[in-house]
């Protein structure tokens, strides 16, 4: 049995199929060695990743853009731009210019020498208004006192078909309550803030142009809300004094606003 197996193995070793297989096994190591011993291709060598010059170029462009942006911001900076202009100003002109930038110009500032007395609850107090005119006037004839009633201004605008504000007031009007102690008109939120201050300012300007002796003004039923009070003092003039007729009226938000700066007084 052993001899037969040995002879069978000998015949298989000398068979063509076995010889082909053994030759392939012997050749495989040399083929694999040649495969892994080849040098990298030239394209791999050339692809060295981002070059240093690329980073330098990006950095240079970024720096240039940054400098341009900073210079643009400096040109728009009031402190920087004004400093450049100072060489063309005299010292007095420069101080005046800066002061003008710090605050918005009022239509009637302190240099106008005019006084403005706000009376937000004047609608039902005609006798008190006459007393106030005598109180604030420097003349026995009271010819230096002008009276502006916001209720009358609104009605005048709404009844004037050519008014620049009439249509706007009509379309935003919510209610007209004649029994109100203050401004009888109320409007919705679409009405732009400051329109009543503009109406009062225009009326004051007209009155002063027609009667230059006027330098005391009673503003009746005005300011009619807090935004108008703030807008009036920003754009038109400072309120000299706000006058009410009883303690209950001091609870109004507009009155409280002026009370914080001690401008509220009670007139009996």
From Swiss-Prot:
An annotated GO cellular component of this protein is: mitochondrial membrane
Q: Source gene?
A: AIM36
Cell compartments where the protein resides: Mitochondrion membrane
Record keywords: Membrane, Mitochondrion, Transit peptide, Transmembrane, Transmembrane helix
Cite the residue span of the transit peptide: 1-36
Q: Which family does it belong to?
A: Belongs to the AIM36 family.
Give disulfide pairs as residue numbers: none
Q: Membrane-spanning residues where? A: 54-70
| Record membrane topology | Single-pass membrane protein
Q: What is this protein called?
A: Altered inheritance of mitochondria protein 36, mitochondrial
